[in-house]
């Protein structure tokens, strides 16, 4: 377990704690947001601390003197901008952007923050303001009271980055929805829910059928009205369809909004939680039937207003509900089939022991009863291997000591005891679809699990044993690939379980062991080369003008590489000969040095040296020389890829740039150098 991290501010009365898919944490305070960035480098702290300031967004705020008295809100009258809620986007939206930090302020505006430093992540600045994408009249339409991101979903023939939905709840009773993907800008469609201020939003998981997917968006208003939108998207369209869906159960009306949260799916079932002061409702939704089937309810111990509700699960049949109150208490329940009960499991005891240990470790006062612990934020990590806990300790016995201690807050991870089931869930998710399971986040979760296990285990051995059934030889892979009738998309390279298994092993060797696994790297390169050549042959048969001169240069490298490395593999040679015949490429093809025009023989896939000694790096995908070309590099394994400006919108280079938009070798996201 990592050492506590002391945060830079006293927790405000507005509780928020959020964890990104790549392991970053954000904690909400008044005029700034504390951000913790995980570090895997040797001899460095576990987390690098940074702050996002809201000072630079004040000039965008409305002039209070221009507002009528009935249009004024409390946030308009405060002297400074205050963060009310923070949440991470499920992915970055462009190269050089990790998941964006979404901040909702007391002035009912929403901003995206990102780090401008790619190394230390110390400077976080505003990169987008959502009010510029919303209607400005009437004012209620652009006053935002709630924010939510859907999970990522990857559809056939779509970008490896996946797509997601971004929702804003407005004061007018509208929900603004936008589809977000790689290199996209927000374009909102507004839906009138016929209710008061929309103050709570929560997305369910996606239900994918063929090339379309659906999810539910649950909404609650300030006056307690509940609305549910069913949203459908398709890989053939840039827009989406919506329809209202009713809860088939009647609840006693309560004139205030509950907290909302959806669980992750378990055996094709997920739960929608509605949490009121003193009461919890859990609605069971069957994804295969597409409807709510039953609901459970339970009284809470605390009658305080809830400030957060989160879900987790430990194995194949139990879902947990974590409820945090404004008084700083945390209640945990288990959902099993048709029952709900206060959780009394090993994980509960771990939590209590963890908190009691912290109460004993802070200060030198002998009487532990005078120490007070408050939990300000509790957030399970994306893969549930641990939970982020934000807490503070106060000592009311001494006024002087109260001031000293109360101005400190801390963060730590609570490890999960169900490491085997969590590990299995993590591996399964990564094998099925690397697109919606970012490599950096998955590897960080495995690293956290490795650090918190009582019995030290060789994670590489665990990974190898778990993935052994998915690892196939290069020859078997080539044989299966050669029998494919039509290779229509390069994105399918990220949906192959064998490739994803190799990516996990290779990514772990680089991420934790700080060493390249040459065998895995070469095998991945062999498979990439053959797949691209087969894809090219498929595209040439449809469009003879598919290849530009630059595209042909890439294929010449592929042919040379195949002749050199795979000369004893008949299947690979057959494909290379077919490409060479159409391009009239000889087996002794050579390149020209960009500096002196001397001959460069193709002897290495990473480096190229001309006859006069000039050394050039090669693109890890195309193997072209990186002379004057712009390039980007993977944030996980540091592989370098050239940025091309293809002369045609539909050609091999354009497809490589668009469809291989995350690292082929480990699934990491690219940074622009």
UniProtKB/Swiss-Prot annotation:
Q: Where in the cell is it found?
A: Nucleus
**UniProt GO MF annotations:** histone acetyltransferase activity; RNA polymerase III general transcription initiation factor activity
Which residues lie in coiled coils? none
* InterPro entries, per the entry: GTF3C4 (IPR044230), TFIIIC_delta_N (IPR024761), TFIIIC_Znf (IPR024764), WD40_repeat_dom_sf (IPR036322)
Paired cysteines (S-S): none
Listed Pfam families: TFIIIC_delta (PF12657), zf-TFIIIC (PF12660)
Write out the GO cellular component annotations: nucleus; transcription factor TFIIIC complex
GO BP term, pick one: transcription by RNA polymerase III
| Protein origin, superkingdom | Eukaryota
Q: Does the keyword Transcription apply?
A: yes
Q: Which SUPFAM superfamilies match?
A: WD40 repeat-like
Q: What is its main location?
A: nucleus
Q: Which UniProt keywords apply?
A: Nucleus, Transcription, Transcription regulation
Subunit record text: May be a component of the TFIIIC complex.
Q: What is this protein called?
A: Putative transcription factor tau subunit sfc9
């Amino acid at each position: 377990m990592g050492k506590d991290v002391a945060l830079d501010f006293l927790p405000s009365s507005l509780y928020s704690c959020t964890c990104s898919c790549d392991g970053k944490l954000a904690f909400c305070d008044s005029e700034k947001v504390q951000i913790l960035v995980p570090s895997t480098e040797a001899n460095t702290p576990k987390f690098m601390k940074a702050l996002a300031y809201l000072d630079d967004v004040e000039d965008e705020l409305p002039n209070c003197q221009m507002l009528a008295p009935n249009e004024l809100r409390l946030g308009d009258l405060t002297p400074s901008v205050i963060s009310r809620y923070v949440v991470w986007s499920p992915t970055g939206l462009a190269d050089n952007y990790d998941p964006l930090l979404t901040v909702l302020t007391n002035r009912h505006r929403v901003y995206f923050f990102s780090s401008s430093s790619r190394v230390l992540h110390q400077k976080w600045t505003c990169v987008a303001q959502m009010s510029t994408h919303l209607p400005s009249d009437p004012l209620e339409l652009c006053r935002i009271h709630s924010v939510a991101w859907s999970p990522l979903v990857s559809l056939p023939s779509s970008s490896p980055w996946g797509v997601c939905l971004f929702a804003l709840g407005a004061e007018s009773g509208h929900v603004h929805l936008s589809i977000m993907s790689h290199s996209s800008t927000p374009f909102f469609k507004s839906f009138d829910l016929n209710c008061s201020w929309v103050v709570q939003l929560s997305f369910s998981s996606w239900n994918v059928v063929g090339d379309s997917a659906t999810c539910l968006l649950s909404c609650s208003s300030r006056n307690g009205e509940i609305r549910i939108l069913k949203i459908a998207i398709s890989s053939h369209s840039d827009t989406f369809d919506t329809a209202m869906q009713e809860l088939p159960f009647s609840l006693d009306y309560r004139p205030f909004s509950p907290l909302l949260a959806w669980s992750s799916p378990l055996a094709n079932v997920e739960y929608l939680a509605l949490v009121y002061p003193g009461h919890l409702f859990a609605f069971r939704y069957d994804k295969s039937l597409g409807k709510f089937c039953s609901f459970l309810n339970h009284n809470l111990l605390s009658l305080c207003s809830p400030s957060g509700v989160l879900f987790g699960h430990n194995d194949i049949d139990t879902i947990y509900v974590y409820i945090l109150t404004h008084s700083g208490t945390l209640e945990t329940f288990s959902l099993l089939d048709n029952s709900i009960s206060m959780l009394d499991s090993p994980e509960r005891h771990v939590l209590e022991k963890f908190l009691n240990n912290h109460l004993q470790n802070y200060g030198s006062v002998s009487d532990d009863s005078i120490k007070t612990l408050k939990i300000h934020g509790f957030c399970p990590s994306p893969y549930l291997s641990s939970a982020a806990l934000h807490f503070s300790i106060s000592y009311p016995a001494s006024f002087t000591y109260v001031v000293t201690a109360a101005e400190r807050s801390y963060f730590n991870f609570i490890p999960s005891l169900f490491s085997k089931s969590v590990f299995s869930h993590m591996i399964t998710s990564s094998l099925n679809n690397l697109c919606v399971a970012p490599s950096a986040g998955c590897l960080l979760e495995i690293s956290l699990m490795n650090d918190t296990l009582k019995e030290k285990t060789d994670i590489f051995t665990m990974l190898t044993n778990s993935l052994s059934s998915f690892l196939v030889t290069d020859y078997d892979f080539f044989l299966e690939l050669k029998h494919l009738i039509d290779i229509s998309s390069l994105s399918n390279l990220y949906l192959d379980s064998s490739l994803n298994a190799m990516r996990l092993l290779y990514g772990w060797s680089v991420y934790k062991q700080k060493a390249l696994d040459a065998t895995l790297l070469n095998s991945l390169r062999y498979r990439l080369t053959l797949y691209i050549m087969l894809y090219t042959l498929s595209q040439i048969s449809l469009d003879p003008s598919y290849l530009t001169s630059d595209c042909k240069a890439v294929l010449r490298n592929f042919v040379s590489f195949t002749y050199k490395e795979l000369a004893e593999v008949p299947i690979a040679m057959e494909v290379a000969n077919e490409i060479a015949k159409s391009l009239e490429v000889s087996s002794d093809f050579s390149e020209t040095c960009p500096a002196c025009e001397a001959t460069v023989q193709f002897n290495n896939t990473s480096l190229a040296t001309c006859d006069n000694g000039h050394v050039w790096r090669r693109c890890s995908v195309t193997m072209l020389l990186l002379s004057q070309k712009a390039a980007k590099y993977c944030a996980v394994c540091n592989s370098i890829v050239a940025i091309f400006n293809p002369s045609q919108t539909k050609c091999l280079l354009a497809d490589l740039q668009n469809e291989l938009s995350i690292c082929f070798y480990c699934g990491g996201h690219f940074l622009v150098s």
